[in-house]
Each structure stands twice: as C-alpha cells, then as structure tokens.
Amino acid sequence: MRKTILVFVSILMLLQAAAVRLEAIPAFARKYQMTCKTCHSPFPKLKDYGEEFAGNGFVIKDKDAPRYYVDTGDDFLSLLRDLPIALRLEGFVTYNNANSQQLDFTSPYLLKFLSGGAITKNIAYYFYFFFSERGEVAGIEDAFIMFNDLFGSDLDFYIGQFQVSDPLFKRELRLSFEDYQIYKAAPGDSQANLTYDRGIMFTYGLPSNTDITVEILNGTGIGEANPLRNFDSDKYKNLAFRVSQDMGDAFRLGGFAYLGKEAPDNISNSMWMLAADATVSIKPLEFNLQYLERRDDNPFFAAPDLAPAEKVKTRGGFAELIYLPKGDDSRWYLLGLLNWVDSDTSELDYGSATFHYGRLLRRNIRATVELTYAFKSVYDKHVRMAVGLITGF
C-alpha cells in the first residue's frame, strides 16, 4: 500500500511539472477574448454567469465578437467566419478500480471534440463528439439546436439529445472522477434514466427568480436507430418537469417529476420519479444535495401470461461539498461527495464516500487526486485511488 501511494505522489508531481508549460484557450473564451474563469470556477464547473451565458445561446448580450460572421453581401445569410471548436482531454492513473487490485494507466480516459455557438440571432447549436471514451469511439452525446427568447419572452426551446438531469446538476461538468450514481440508475431492462436522451426541452425564467423546465423525451437513451430508422422503440413519450427557485443569493431549492412508459416488445413498464434538490452557496463553500425516488411496475418486461410483473422501488441521491478558498481566484479546491443508491434490484445498490483535491496548473489545466471508499457495491467494499490531469483547449 505504501508503494502504491508513493507511485501516485510521483505521478502527480510529474503531471504538474509537465502541465505548467502548457497554455490554451477554450472556444468561447477564444471568441470573446476573455478568461475561462468568467464562466467556470474551476473548469468545467459552471458559475451562475456561465449558466446565463449558455442560456443566452452562447452569446454575451451587448457584446459582439469582432468579425464573427462573414460579410457575403447577403443580409439574409449568417455564415460563421470560423467554426468554434475546442478539445477536452482527460487522463488518469487509477488503483483498485472496481476492486480489481490493479494499478492502471487510464489515459486517455476521454478525448472530446466540442463545438458550439450562435448560428444567427437567437439560434445556437452545441455538440460534442468522443474521439475516445474509455478506449472506444463513443460518438456524439450532447447535440442540440437552441432557439432563444421565443416570442420576445424568456422562453427557450431545445431539440436534439441532451442529459435529462442537466436542469438539476450537470454530471458532465462535475469536478470528480466519481459519478452522480443515482442519475444512471435504471432497474431491470428499463432504458429510461436521467442521463442522455433524445427529445425537446422548454425552459422559462420568471421575474421571481423561478426557473421552469419541461422535457418531452423518447425515453430510450441515445443508441442507434432500429431497422425502421426510428430511435424510439415504442409509441410512448416520457415527460419531465422541473422547477427551481432562488431564495436570496445563497440558497436555491428545486423539485423534479418524471412520468414515463416504455414497451419495446409490446410489453410495458410504467415508471415515475420524484426528486428534490438544493444548493447552499456561502463563500468559500458550496453544498449541493439531491434526493430521488423511483417506481417501476414491470422493469423486467415480464409477459402477463407467463410470469407476474415485478414492481421495483429505487431511491437514492448524493451530497456534494466544494471548498474554494479564494472563490474564482482559487488555485486549488477540495471536494467531498457522498453517493447512495438503494433498490429492490440489488445490482443497483451503491454507497460511496469520496475525497477529492484539485489544483489548477493553468486556468484550463487541472490536476486531481481522489480517494473513494465504496462501502456498498456489486464489487464488495473497496477503496479506489485516482490521480488525473484534465485539460481544455
């Protein structure tokens, strides 16, 4: 164990020595010639201003990017002069992942190609493509068109594929190697969870600092089309509703409801989810809390004439505490994360406690050390260690 810790410390020192010589600017910072910390603290975690920027179609109001469009002489054409692109590269060295008792060079863990921006006034796009995700070409995950400020109001419309949980907490922008496990939980053969799906989303902000989100979804994830060239495997659509209320500058409370039905082979499973979440932000601390209840009436798709349907209860959540000693100007931070999933389907049961230390080597280069104790898992109790380097440029 002592030798393993020495190896981890040595690797972290090598990563820091190599990374301090690198410099890069992500796509939106490049476009507006602004620092990454305008929207991120630390990257890729979004600040409130970053959320506002994304909600405005990746445009800073009252600030035009110089020479953003090509002047073709056709006023009816909006043609980007340069395609906004960025890359995100992550690599880790892990020990005892999934209780394997192995030291593993998990690098590159992912290599992501990102592009996004305004196509024209109030219309924007965003997508990213995985050149590599844990050793395979995973393809497109987020990919959508956004219509901003419809009918002159604060109503926004998205169509494409996105994470269902994005209006709650954005798991793709989390700081930890450890995931938000409850968002991935789906009992039996159900395809519906709170990760990626295809559909449409409406968002609306009220003057009372109330944010409302409605999602209409296929409920089948983002797999390939069937032989009929349909992405959905049945005639049903799932509905998600979200409301979030700011209560002053330091506290936010949210609620979420999900109602769905799936019948891939004409045998149905009906489900619902209810969730509550909260954020308390009192500098230099931020505390995020998520709780979710889920019910499925036939997630194993038992045929009524052959076997009785098995109802499944699933519940869980996470609690995350982030410490930024100097706020936006912090060069290092600490994070603690508790995960909990409890289900009638035992393979979903999970519990873990994570401690994470991160240090910015540059504004867009982050080195991390993470220790996770999984006290409930299909792999039995175990400790996982990970040292990582995350870059965006």
Role assignments for model-derived ranges:
Residues D234, S244-D344:
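Detector for outer-membrane/organellar transmembrane beta-barrel domains
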Residues T72-S78, I119-K121, M146-F151, L206-S208, ...:
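Outer-membrane beta-barrel proteins
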Residues P44-K47, L80-Y95, N99-I222, K235-L239, ...:
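Outer membrane beta-barrel
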Residues Q33-F43:
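The canonical Cys-X-X-Cys-His
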Residues R67-T72, L83, G91, Y109-L111, ...:
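Hydrophobic, lipid-facing positions within transmembrane beta-strands of outer-membrane proteins
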